[in-house]
């Protein structure tokens, strides 16, 4: 029955569903994982790299994380060619605003502009939705640090921590639990890095997390300037080693506790 309604973007099914939008969301759920965490002193984006071939040119820009302007960065999950179109459009929107008004575009306004375009592709015939979701991290004078997520339907929202891509449900559950445990504690960027490694280690479909499989970037304010930096492979490796050591110590303590328990 669904085949009657899923060939065109603009036709609702009897249940009120737009199948092409749902198929776009399904494509994203098979893409590499991306997660974002909002901290007190900055924002973190972390992403799974699936193109780890040693023949790839390391000078080519990031596979998953893109700088949009001086104050905003985004991470993508989904069809890469669609992501390239949308990131180019985001940069153009930001440049036009800065040229017209002489200041950097507010974060939410940039996200909203792009989502209007994405929503239009769910409403006009002869087009299909963009098969990509985006995470945006940014800073502006009004709201400070901000983390947003948008999907193929054109919907967007602000988050403290979220995830898109493969195994996003398990990752969001972990983030929710970890942040609930630290509800009364201010989360620093260093804590966010450790948390990102923990979540990726436990949710990626890989036997062992390596620096080649992870991209991490941070955004901070230093001396009244927004500073965007991508973590180098040795820095990521140190974070992975730290997590591995903590896990080994926790496992050893658990076994020791079990050994001390009296047998019935």
UniProtKB/Swiss-Prot annotation:
Keywords: Cytoplasm, Nucleus, Proteasome. The keyword DNA damage does not apply. Pfam families: Proteasome, Proteasome_A_N. GO terms for biological process: proteasome-mediated ubiquitin-dependent protein catabolic process. InterPro entries: Ntn_hydrolases_N, Proteasome_alpha, Proteasome_alpha-type, Proteasome_asu_N, Proteasome_bsu_CS, Proteasome_sua/b. Gene3D superfamilies: Glutamine Phosphoribosylpyrophosphate, subunit 1, domain 1 (3.60.20.10). It is found in: Cytoplasm; Nucleus. GO terms for cellular component: cytoplasm; cytosol; nucleus; proteasome complex; proteasome core complex; proteasome core complex, alpha-subunit complex. The proteasome is a multicatalytic proteinase complex which is characterized by its ability to cleave peptides with Arg, Phe, Tyr, Leu, and Glu adjacent to the leaving group at neutral or slightly basic pH. The proteasome has an ATP-dependent proteolytic activity. Belongs to the peptidase T1A family. The 26S proteasome consists of a 20S proteasome core and two 19S regulatory subunits. The 20S proteasome core is composed of 28 subunits that are arranged in four stacked rings, resulting in a barrel-shaped structure. The two end rings are each formed by seven alpha subunits, and the two central rings are each formed by seven beta subunits. The catalytic chamber with the active sites is on the inside of the barrel. Interacts with PI31. This is Proteasome subunit alpha type-4. It comes from Drosophila melanogaster.
